[in-house]
Amino acid sequence: MDKKTSRLRRATRARKKIQELGVNRLVVHRTPRHIYAQVINPEAQVLAAASTVEKAVKELLKSTGNVDAAKAVGKFVAERAIEKGVTSVAFDRSGFKYHGRVAALADAAREAGLKF
């Protein structure tokens, strides 16, 4: 089993557990160059999203693949979710380690007002 398959298996296992809870989830996807975050409801509808690909976020950053970029995305997605009335979510790290950029995004979202 390769690295990607292992990550996807972990992600599927976590998503099934979150699905049983029936709560909104903050999903994170990470690539070497960018980071993406979405708040998704139990019916699989995207309520809020932010990424380093967006012009509004990219203009604030020197680089899109570092911890500072992840913090900016976490702040933006939390603000947009709160505007839609979502204050509590489950954190779905998509099988990535809770470390570095993923942890920075989560911390920034918490500081901006999301609870998880």
From Swiss-Prot:
Pfam family, one: Ribosomal_L18p
This protein's record includes keyword Ribosomal protein: yes
Superkingdom of the organism of origin: Bacteria
Record's keyword terms, sorted: Ribonucleoprotein, Ribosomal protein, RNA-binding, rRNA-binding
GO terms (BP aspect): translation
A cellular component annotation (GO) from this entry: cytosolic large ribosomal subunit
GO molecular function, one term: 5S rRNA binding
SUPFAM superfamilies for the chain: Translational machinery components
Subunit-level organization: Part of the 50S ribosomal subunit; part of the 5S rRNA/L5/L18/L25 subcomplex. Contacts the 5S and 23S rRNAs.
Known role: This is one of the proteins that bind and probably mediate the attachment of the 5S RNA into the large ribosomal subunit, where it forms part of the central protuberance.
Family: Belongs to the universal ribosomal protein uL18 family.
Protein's name according to its UniProt entry: Large ribosomal subunit protein uL18
Originating organism: Shewanella baltica (strain OS155 / ATCC BAA-1091)
